[in-house]
Every structure is written in C-alpha cells, then in structure tokens.
Amino acid sequence: GVVYEDPWRAGGHNGLSNSEDPNVPEDPRPRVAELRKVMNDLGLNSVPIVMAGGVWYMRDWADWIEDPDVAPVAFQFGTRPLLTQESPISKEWKTRLLTLEEGDIFLNKFSPTGFYSSAVRNPFLRELKGRSDRQIAFVEEAEGDLHHEFKIGARGRQIFVTASDKALAEKWVSEGYTDGLRTPDSTVIFVSAEKSKEIQKDQSDCMGCLSQCQFSNWAQNEAATTGRRPDPRSYCIQKTLQDIVHGDPVDDQLMFAGHNAFKFKDDPFYSNGFIPTVKELIDRL
C-alpha cells in the first residue's frame, strides 16, 4: 500500500511542506483522489492507499470505501492505540490523553529535524516557544540601526542590536533570562542560566540519531557537521522521547499526538476513564 499522511492532522512528524500553511488545514480527499489517479495511470489500480491522520470513527470515512476516485483504501490509527491496556506508555500519559481539549494539539516547528510535528501543547513546548519569543537579531560589527552595544556570554562578548531590541534584552535579563545563546540565523535567544547549561549539555551529548540534526549540528557526512551553528531553539529528540516513554513527567517532555486526540475526552467509549484492550478497540472500530 501507499500511505497518505495528512500533514495537518497526523501526529508526530507529518510532512507539512514550507509551501503549506500550518494554520489552514486542507481537505484530504482531493489530494488522495489525485494520488489515486497517478497510481492508476501507473498500473497500480489494486494497490490500496492507506489514509493516516485524522481517522477516529470509521463511519466518518464510509463514503471512501467504495468510491472509485480513491478506492481501494485502508485506514491507519496512530493515536487511538496509545490509550489501550497493552500500550507501553505511562499511566500518567494515558490519563493526560483523557483530559485534552480541542486546541491542545500544537503543530510546531521546533523539531531538530527541521520539519513540522504535531504534539500536545504542554510546558515543554511552551518553554520552547518562550525561547523563540525571547529572540532578537544582532550583528558583530555595528551597522545601520544595529549599532547599540550589548554583551552576552560568560566572557561578555560584544554584539550590536537595535535600540528597541536592547531594551527587550535588558528586560529579559532582569526577569532571570540572563544567558544569551546565538542561533544559526544571526539572532540570539535569552534563557536562564540553568536552561543554558541543559541545552549545551544536551548538544554535547549528541549520539547522532538523525542524519542531520539542527539542534547539535551533527550530520551523517565526512565532516560530521551540518556546517551551521547548533540551534538552541530546538531540543534533543532522542532524549525527550526516551524520557517520556520511561516514565518522566509528561509535562516536561515531548508528547506526540494526532490532531484528534482531544476526542478521547468526549468519546463515550472512554467514559469514566475506561481504557480498552486492543481487541476491545478493534471491536469498537
């Protein structure tokens, strides 16, 4: 089969391109119909398309099953099996899934892969958003409006920023975000001293789990580097995924989830905190 992963509704990394608006989801059917036409033209008429992302009730997709414009078609469930007795995620994680509200799933671009991913909007993601919000442009030699001196780092390295950005930086420092970390985009973000140490340790502990990592600048090439400065606006994905699956507090880690995860709360199947077995879930579907 050929999997069509809805780039707005699927959980985790979902293939949203830079030409698509993360805030304007599109109907998957025209895209799947276009894919089916291409496959049929290539003689793949009998190969099913697997619809992934946004699938909750099979009744919502009944009109697809016999539709020649998309059929043969199958459906993939990624989020619902998380909330089963056999699922290896922690009890806290399962409990949290039962409380999510619509809008709690956040399509974000903090991933070290450089791609969008869909995850629960928890303190982990809010902290990442805060890093990017506390960000200003700088140059190393004064030019134009960027001529106001500001010092960052333990050695007080001099950079030049605009007057308004200098005022922002001074405000953030007064709030406890004392450490300025440079990004590969000629900007600097402000974080606490504790967070700065954590970021730098995670970067130095990189185990090369990605072929290219924006966070650590590791790359699977002869130079072992992307050639860009490590990006402190991101995070170590291997560390956070290992930590959450091994029982760390879910608010402190990345919680991948599909857009429909908020439906756990109001679906009568999960009333009173009911967690089904895989068999019970399949029977329900």
Identify the function of each model-found stretch.
Residues 1-7:
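Non-cysteine beta-strand/loop elements that form the S-adenosyl-L-methionine
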Residues 52-57:
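Gly/Ser-rich catalytic serine loop of serine hydrolases
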